[in-house]
Amino acid sequence: MLVTLTEAKQYLRVDTGDEDIVIRGLLASATRLCVDVARLTEEQWSDINSDKTRSERYNTAELTAARETMRVAVLYALGYLYEHREDADHRELTLTLRSLLFALREGVV
């Protein structure tokens, strides 16, 4: 898993388990949103979301870069969705994610 619940809670600065269910749901949504915005195929996402050091599609450096990029994007999306649960502007979020994920979207990584 690219971002664990523990990492997500640390990023959100949540110390208790009271919101674990909400955070898990938002983390799943943030991850899916980033995969969709990056236009990753299931095979590409499987490579990035695994512990592999290389694959048919990516060498080690590319996998590392893709994982770091996706991790930042997922955490950003998670934070946004968590903070704006009531009034999220998904257009603004999507535009920011497109910028963050540009290299993946265009196949540069």
Where are the regions that the model predicts?
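Divalent metal-cofactor coordination and adjacent catalytic microenvironments
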Residues: 1-109
